[in-house]
Amino acid sequence: MSKRDTMIRALCKSLGVDYRVTTIDLERVIYRDFGNGFNVEISGMHTSSMKKKATIYLWYGDTMTECIIVKTVRDIPRELIGENVEELMKYSNLLIAQGYDSYDKLFRLKYGKTINYAGGVKNMTHRIF
């Protein structure tokens, strides 16, 4: 096992049993499913450097066609990853409490509206990927 693999597994273990190491978009990342439709991807930690900072993505959805990045938090030191993930879980619960509990609602929150790219065909909207 490489030093990078050892480091990411140790970090994952330190975060707790709710986390796991997996591959997303060809990158080894740490993942946590909140169980409420939201999940987090902790990117940038498959490294042998203790100084490398993480990027944490809050996602909604679990299938390729129904996923959206809701929030991105950058430059998080290793020792603050767990705290930031807990804040994102609180944020996800707040979104749900405010009615943002579907891909379409979160898309409209993030981008302002659903955009019609159908050349003027009434009521035909397409998502941007």
Where do the language-model regions lie?
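A short acidic-to-branched-hydrophobic micro-motif
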Residues: 40-44
